[in-house]
Amino acid sequence: MFSMLYNKVEKRQEWLDCAVQGGEFLKKYGHDGNYNWYFSLDRSGRPLVEPYNIFSYTFATMAFGQLSLATGSQEYADIAKKTFKIILSKVDNPKSKWNKLHPGTRNLKNFALPMILCNLALEIEHLLDPGYLEQTMETCIHEVMDVFYRPELGGIIVENVDMDGNLVDCFEGRQVTPGHAIEAMWFIMDLGKRLNRPELIQQAMLTTLTMLDYGWDKQCGGIYY
């Protein structure tokens, strides 16, 4: 966060100092030595939760990507690129050996990873090959707006589909998380701006309004979880 503020808001030395301090702490304690990032640590750096969650990896990549941009450090850039490579290797099984699901029974594709990759690609744009970046952005847009976005359900976004992108008639297949979808539309709008595609921004805006209406608690206000 402090790296991003330094890069995009104001070149304040105290922000950069905080970012470097946090980056050095994570570099020393945040992973197992092979850039498998623990989910949480105590204040002394001892791991509390194993690296079962791929979002530990995505946020570490964002952090070191922005820190490399702020400092010009090749070491931080290499950490971000190595971690990003691990993320891509885990796309088909994000939880790896910590996956609790019985294999071969109900294989589902989850919305969370392609959604966060939309954001991650832009956050580390300066570290990626332009051709690869273009391909990644298009793949993420396709996954979010062609696979998980369901016009046959009134234009809402579902959390899980089968491995072929079809709806699944089960609890997980019927799950809708409005706030998650709205967050994803923010990322899609950013991609629309980056790619100069106003029609994509418009589609994301309309989907945001649809999800707000679908998920709104009309009695008490607020968005259902």
Residues covered by each model-derived region:
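Glycan-recognition and catalytic cores of secretory/periplasmic carbohydrate-active enzymes
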Residues: 1-225
